[in-house]
């Protein structure tokens, strides 16, 4: 039992360390330290889809402020790039840990505990466009494939990912599968191609509904790109044979500029956010144009080691029935 546990931990560490090294080298980012707490009222907290309640924390020696455990570091990263004067093409990555207690379900792929490679880069002049988004996606996908090949060489786990990732807009997907739900569409397209980047998540589609929810103040999901499609963000999805479904590894995108921010908060009715310090700084031109995202660490490990449950690669909290159903939950 001890031997199996140690081997399990070594595998997890190998995947994380290998991916980190490739990501830093290929994406050309520097690893930095990030926060676990965000001060309430400064607008730095990531509101995700806008419905999640963060964990509130009171600090004894700072009685005049309330803090929250971060959901992600989307806004903090952009603030940090500005604060320390990162130049065009430069960026950072954080080994981020967060709590999301309002997850809809605790299942094979969802946990209260979230760990990500949370990265952000300053966009080079003239590249705030779909082509640069795709170029960055291809770089990250290359890192995923290189890590998968390293796992294959070390642990004899067969590599399954295609050489290229397929790009498709959410508008194309709803037209292709009009009678399917968003999740069913993801399953259909990802099973066909093996690896997909789904572009444009957050805006309302021709069927009157968004593909999925996104907060209005980090990713740009409204800018028109090509053929009348909208959005400069998306998800990296791969086909997971263990689960028999599409599997999200990363959510990422080009971040809002001043116009996209104002447009999106009006669409979602969140104009009050424009009064936060972070949002004022963006509107006043104090932040660089950036691209960024989060890559799930436990999800990456789970996929590359062909595990059935995310609890096999991270230590979290689970209902007893989950622990009873899976022998290798940590």
Swiss-Prot record:
It comes from the Bacteria. GO terms for molecular function: aspartate-ammonia ligase activity; ATP binding; catalytic activity, acting on a protein; transferase activity. Its EC number is 6.3.1.1. One of its GO terms (cellular component) is cytosol. Signal peptide: none annotated. Gene3D superfamilies: Bira Bifunctional Protein, Domain 2. Belongs to the class-II aminoacyl-tRNA synthetase family. AsnA subfamily. This is Aspartate--ammonia ligase. It comes from Streptococcus pyogenes serotype M1.
């Amino acid at each position: 039992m001890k031997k199996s546990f140690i081997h399990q931990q070594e595998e997890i560490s190998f995947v994380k360390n290998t991916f980190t090294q490739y990501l830093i080298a290929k994406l050309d980012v520097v690893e930095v330290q990030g926060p676990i707490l965000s001060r309430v009222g400064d607008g730095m907290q990531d509101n995700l889809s806008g419905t999640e309640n963060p964990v509130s924390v009171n600090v004894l020696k700072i009685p005049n402020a309330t803090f929250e455990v971060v959901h992600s570091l989307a806004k903090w990263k952009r603030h940090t790039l500005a604060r320390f004067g990162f130049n065009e093409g430069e960026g950072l990555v954080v080994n981020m840990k967060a709590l999301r207690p309002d997850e809809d379900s605790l299942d094979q792929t969802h946990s209260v505990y979230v760990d990500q490679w949370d990265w952000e880069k300053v966009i080079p002049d003239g590249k705030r466009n779909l082509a640069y988004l795709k170029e960055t996606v291809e770089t990250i996908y290359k890192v995923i494939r290189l890590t998968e090949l390293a796992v294959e060489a070390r642990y004899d786990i067969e590599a399954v990912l295609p050489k290229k990732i397929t790009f498709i807009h959410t508008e194309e997907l709803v037209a292709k599968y009009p009678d399917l739900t968003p999740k069913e569409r993801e399953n259909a397209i990802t099973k066909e191609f093996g690896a997909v980047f789904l572009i444009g998540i957050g805006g309302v589609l021709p069927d009157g509904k968004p593909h999925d929810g996104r907060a209005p103040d980090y990713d740009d999901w409204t800018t028109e790109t090509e053929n009348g499609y909208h959005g400069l963000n998306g998800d990296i999805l791969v086909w997971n044979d263990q689960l028999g479904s599409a599997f999200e590894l990363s959510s990422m995108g080009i971040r809002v500029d001043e116009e996209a921010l104002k447009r999106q908060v009006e669409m979602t009715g969140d104009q009050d956010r424009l009064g936060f310090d972070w949002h004022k700084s963006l509107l006043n031109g104090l932040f660089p144009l950036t691209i960024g995202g989060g890559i799930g660490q436990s999800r990456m490990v789970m996929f590359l080691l062909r595990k059935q449950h995310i609890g096999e690669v991270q230590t979290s909290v689970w209902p007893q029935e989950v622990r009873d159903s899976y022998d290798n939950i940590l």
